[in-house]
Amino acid sequence: LDSESAAYHGAGTCTFYGTANSNQMLMEAMGLHVPGAAFVHPHDGLRELLTREAVKMVLANVKSKNFTPIGRMVDEHVIVNAMVALLATGGSTNHLIHWVAIARAAGIIIDWTDFYHLAKTTPLLASVYPNGKADVNEFQSAGGPAFVIRELIEAGYMFPDVLTVAHGGLREYGKLPVKEDDKLVWKDLPKESSDETIVRTAQFPFNESGGLRLLKGNLGRSVIKISAVPEDRHIIEAPAIVFDAQEELLAAFDRGELEKDFIAVVRFQGPKANGMPELHKLTPPLAVLQNKGFRVAI
């Protein structure tokens, strides 16, 4: 417990760009956050001002004669904006499940093919772990969601004229919140990235296409986030080994039976399985084998 507790270095979400932080990014891209609120550190003095601003926005909306419930705000353009933001930042592939459901709740039908077509034309503008070495705090310092959203709007990849919780539409989300004289104000960002190893302009992206590919074959369909996969591992050719459970793979690893090139096929996983099990615990043993030079995939 002590070692586990020591691994958590502060309040808030985990600092890698996983599902929780992808949620934050997409809420910004949908205009459902106070602009710039996504990755402000919990202990930053700006956080309380943003929280107070959120309360003000909620009350102003409720009391307004032009009350805009979420059902009016989330339309096709808003859903597409979120999809583009996910692809432009190399966000979590879990959202290829979540966003299909969210869109359906809004009466909009999307599927993996839509993500794939958008990915082919959406530039990759961010490099945040696991797509790069930076964490979300460094991403925020380099310009964060505001920089990415501004670039995507100016390059024509996002719809700016949508209903948002902040008056002014999505362009307001391309500005940075700052604290001045104990007040919250938003300022324009510099035109250039403050750290091109973390975030880039739409003219000079990390990749011309978003970090996603749709794979199809005689076993079915899958998606892979290639922005997080080194190029020398884009193609793996090896014999398949079939397991009926994650525990079987772990047991085979412990017995030393996996010291070779192979592709692991783990059955009874994924969205249709009971509880939709994830495969996080298989990452360490597979990484050990990769570090030994074996060509391994799952």
Locate each region found by the language model.
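Catalytic or ion-coupling anion/metal-binding cores of large enzyme and transporter domains
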Residues: L1-I298
